[in-house]
Structure formats: structure tokens, C-alpha cells
Amino acid sequence: MSKQTLVLLYGGRSAEREVSVLSAESVMRAVNYDKFLVKTYFITQMGQFIKTQQFSEKPSESERLMTNETIELTQKIKPSDIYEEGAVVFPVLHGPMGEDGSIQGFLEVLRMPYIGTNVMSSSIAMDKITTKRVLESIGIPQVAYTVYIDGQDLEACLVETLARLTFPIFVKPANMGSSVGISKAQTKVELRKAIQLALTYDSRVLIEQGVIAREIEVGLLGNDKVKSTLPGEVIKDVDFYDYQAKYVDNKITMAIPADVDQSIVTEMRSYAEVAFKALGGCGLSRCDFFLTQDGQVYLNELNTMPGFTQWSMYPLLWENMGLAYPDLIEELVTLAQEIFDQRESHLI
């Protein structure tokens, strides 16, 4: 039986490129090589496409994907050279130029099936501000927030924010994931600095009310018929769950499934599925919730390309549901082909 080609795109232009490499390496080890041939392409910080490795069998634990330190410029290709008839693309890319609809639009122009949400849902979900406004419109609870856009009156924003929110306050770039650029502010001075830091990553800044809450996550899988997982909990040994804690210091553990009341489980899974459909989701996503001590549930964000490292919540959530990592990848490929066929049928 001939193998199907699975194209892995990794790296990318965003500050989350290191997470992308870790995720892609986990995917390349989890693939069922009885069914798939894996071809990998590294996208540099400057947006160049580099042809890297090809795997017909499971690589050793010591083998690493090529990155800036190991690639050769002679391997540079035109982006369109990744095209291969019958191949499915897994864009294991996080953040801007990865989850924001850019690479999805490129792959649609190439007429290649790809894993993950489409152009519209990717771009909406990537923007935390737009996502909040969509979710508010369908009645899904959100923590209180204000917005700052680069060029506006910063002092006026600070006055509005302090009139509506109380410390601690969290400040986030609107279009960034993996907790990149997020700060916790306890004073007006810290709030101003946090906004200025967020502006180095994006021109749109989300300013959120801090809440004392557990962080609970639900995995989603499907196209028209979406399935959700039992929730898992991020248990932190740090003040807040930032990039350093997630990927460098590894100061987190996970409880899967989370120890929460059944009524809360039902509420979270329902909110997750409704949010996924409202944003036009397909393929996969992960919904991140806050659960306060008094039982209030807030949907924090919907992540359209969650981390796929060996310690990432999304694949572990599905393993808890009985879907092993290799089978999860196979299901994602099937969903990608299904949505591609559906999209193509509408263009003929």
C-alpha cells in the first residue's frame, strides 16, 4: 500500500517559532509510518521556505528537525514548491503568519488540504479582541476588559481602564499566543509599562481584569460534527502561566481529567462546542477557560493550533478520551481531506 505524504511546516516568523519546532518534532515521532511519508519544511524568521528532512520511518529520539543553526541556504525553495498532489499539510505554526489565516490562505491558493481551521476562523480566533466580541454576542461569559489601539490617547485609556477594572490586571497583545508578551500589572505604572511591552508585539492590546481562577482546557475535534474532551487543568507553580513557565522552566503540571463538578464539565464542553461553531471552526481547536471559586466559568480564548509537544494539553486530552497521538494525527488528516473536498465542491 502506498503511503500518503504528510507535509510538516514548522518554524515561522512569529515569536512562537521555538514552540513550533518542539511541536513538529513531537508530531514527526508520533506519526504512523506504516501509513504516512513525512516531508518537512522550515520557515525562517524572514519567511524563507527551506526544504529540510524526509522520514519514511520513525526517527530516533536523538534526531532533531533542522532549524536556523543547521539549515543550508542551498535548500531554500519557492513556497509553492511544497505542492505535491495528494499530500496533506500540517502547518504546525503558532502565532502571527501561522494561526492568523495567512498560511491557510496560501495553502488554499495551492489547493492543498491542510490540518486546522480555515482562513476566516483562524484570523478571528487569532485576534483576542475580536474573539471576545464574537463570544459576547452569543452569550458566552467573558472577564471584564478594555482595549488599547496604538496611536490612541494612552492616558485616556488608563483612566477608562482603572474606572472599569481593579488590580491585578493582565495585558496581552491581541494577536499572540503561548503567553508571549503578556504582563501582570499591580499598579498604574506597571500597567503603562505592560501596555508598552504588548505594543512591541502588536498594535492592538487587550487589557483584562485579573481573576482568581483555575485554568481549565477543553479539546475540540471535528468539522460539521464537533467532539469535545473532558476538561484538563493547568496546575501552576508560578504566579501566572507565561511563556517561560510553559516552555522553558516547565513549572506546570496537568490534571487530566480535571477535578470539577459534572455540571461545570457539561457547561464548559457546551460553551466550547458553541464557540467553535460560532467562529466557523473546523479540524481542531482548544478552548481555555477560567473557573472561579464561586463556580463562574469564563471562556478565555480559543486556540486554533494548540501546542503539539509531548507535554502539551491538547494531545493529552484526547489520549484521555481513548484517542492515541498517532490516531489523532490520522483523524486530523481525514478531517483536512474532508473539508478540502467540501471547499473544492463549492468552487466548481
UniProtKB/Swiss-Prot annotation:
It holds the Pfam family Dala_Dala_lig_N. Its main location: cytoplasm. GO terms for cellular component: cytosol. Its cofactor is Mg(2+); Mn(2+). GO terms for molecular function: ATP binding; D-alanine-D-alanine ligase activity; metal ion binding. Binds 2 magnesium or manganese ions per subunit. One of its GO terms (biological process) is regulation of cell shape. This is D-alanine--D-alanine ligase. The lineage of its organism: Bacteria, Bacillati, Bacillota, Bacilli, Lactobacillales.
